Amino acid sequence: MAMAVFKAPLKGEFHGARKMEGKQYKHHLLQQQSTGRRRVFVQTDTGCVLGVELDRNDNVHTVKKRLQIAFNFPTEESSLTFGDMVLKNDLSAVRNDSPLLLKRNLMHRSSSTPCLSPTGNDLQRKDRSGPIEILSHSPCFLSLKQTANDIVKAMKMGVEPIPVNGGLGGAYYFRDEKGQSVAIVKPTDEEPFAPNNPKGFVGKALGQPGLKPSVRVGETGFREVAAYLLDYDHFANVPPTALVKITHSVFNVNDGMDGNKSREKKKLVSSKIASFQKFVPHDFDASDHGTSSFPVASVHRIGILDIRILNTDRHGGNLLVKKLDDGGVGRFGQVELIPIDHGLCLPETLEDPYFEWIHWPQASIPFSEEELDYIQSLDPVKDCEMLRRELPMIREACLRVLVLCTVFLKEAAVFGLCLAEIGEMMTREFRAGEEEPSELEMLCIEAKRLTTEQDVLSPKSDGEGETEFQFDIDYNELDSVYGSETETDEFFAKNPFSNGRSSLGELKESIAEEEEDDEEEAKLTLSLSKLSTSMKNNLSNTMGSGYLKPPKDNQTDKALVSHKSANVQLPLSVNFVKLADMKEVEWVVFLERFQELLYSAFAERKTMTLRNTQRLGTSCKF
């Protein structure tokens, strides 16, 4: 099987930005670099936000000092972080419009020290920005600038936002002068388990493992933006989305988080970092109606995006449906699908995705030529470059997941697999209530074994292969949730996870394990030929516990009744494969071995499909 060659990216700037706008953006970047002046947004791990103007002379100490003055926030035992990087003193790596996180060091997180939110004249004196500030000057977000302007005008006229009742996190409909919803805003500090969650799901600081351990609290916002940026030419119809700093009194601040015992007497103005998504009028969502009338092309396009970004939460509630015509009496007319809620995509490790479309008949229809051309035009390397440029806080671990899943998609499409087959290979199975690795994860396990084997047979010369991505910031927090080594041979050898839920405290106590002898590991290593689907049946006795998916919208009300903290509610999620522990040289070799293994895996999957002549969708006509 020929290796997929990464072709040039799609013609033109993403989302059809005009060339002149792109030139203006580059000129803006050059001007910022020459003057050294930048505007950044510093957020504490309790949710307080301050816009800060930097010049060449500023450093980490001066930024902390400003935060201390503005919020009465203790900064002695804290770290200023920028994505994967812990900033020591130099701020030269920090880009204009970047959000930074000031977090207390692990040993000091138990003492919850609130920050005092500036209000009224204090807020105006310490941060002179407007009510809504988009955290980028990229032409990708031009359409949202007008939306933001419309909202600001409405705010001045007294038009108030409307809190969204559904969901586990805080969200707000912001309206224009006519009172019509034009954007939905989700503050990062109101996510599930974040400090200011308005629905009782609290217990964690920003930057700690969240609803899914591989997606940290406060980091779903930039994932929403990443999904929009990766949806080139609006192929999957993701609504325009940006990160913003937004100020309003409607936002929730839990008691103690802003230094006030009660906010009932006077609603205080709060500044938040939030995702800002254009509101799309629609008639219902996919869970409200049968899916058989959904366009094949729309299902395929959304599925292609979900596979690329390893969406772990694609259910009917986050697929909006807009009717294009009535279809006549007794008929269902044409519809348009709008995918939303991408905050649980691009996890830091391979997770079990959730693709509700996987059993829809449309997913079993072969890709069209247009879809195949689109897939083959995707370039994961350039995707990563673009995301680093537009979302400099994104973690390298997330980008590795993007690269791996895009390579898998491209090779599978070339081989002739349909959307359902690709999705099934990425999805884990449960046997007797126990979770097994997906076929994709098994391929990764074997590719890592071959990479390690090549490393042993071809030792590096001194000084070679020293380059390594920055995964230094609190990656041990993810390890403490998953277990420091829960993959490959070691997992099969000695990790029979218990069934049921476990709190974070219990998980941390269960990760202390000794390493196996090399001889034992060699005996337990499984070759690819043994990792077939039939072999998986024999492995179920050694696999881990089941994984509980986030509740759908129609399950929200029951979930909200408990009001339990994160330590009680987080289930144990098994991690079979970790990509971030490889050095850059190892990562390149791993991808080569991974691609070499794909042909036989795809051939076996195709054989299985041909055996199943009664497969769902073969008799459907569209």
From Swiss-Prot:
Domain Ubiquitin-like: from-to ranges: 38-95
Physiological role: The phosphorylation of phosphatidylinositol (PI) to PI4P is the first committed step in the generation of phosphatidylinositol 4,5-bisphosphate (PIP2), a precursor of the second messenger inositol 1,4,5-trisphosphate (InsP3).
Pfam short name (any one): PI3_PI4_kinase
Sites of Phosphoserine modification: 565
Keyword flag Nucleotide-binding: yes
Enzyme class of the recorded protein, top EC level: transferase
Family according to the record: Belongs to the PI3/PI4-kinase family. Type II PI4K subfamily.
Residues noted as binding ATP in the record, renumbered to the chain: 165-171, 186, 277-280, 341
Catalytic activity as recorded in UniProt: a 1,2-diacyl-sn-glycero-3-phospho-(1D-myo-inositol) + ATP = a 1,2-diacyl-sn-glycero-3-phospho-(1D-myo-inositol 4-phosphate) + ADP + H(+)
G-loop as annotated region, ranges: 164-170
Residue ranges, annotated region (Activation loop): 339-365
Domain PI3K/PI4K catalytic: 158-459
Region called Catalytic loop, residue ranges: 310-318
Enzyme Commission code: 2.7.1.67
GO molecular function: 1-phosphatidylinositol 4-kinase activity; ATP binding
Keywords of this entry: ATP-binding, Kinase, Nucleotide-binding, Phosphoprotein, Transferase
Native source organism of the sequence: Arabidopsis thaliana (Mouse-ear cress)
Designated name of the protein: Phosphatidylinositol 4-kinase gamma 6
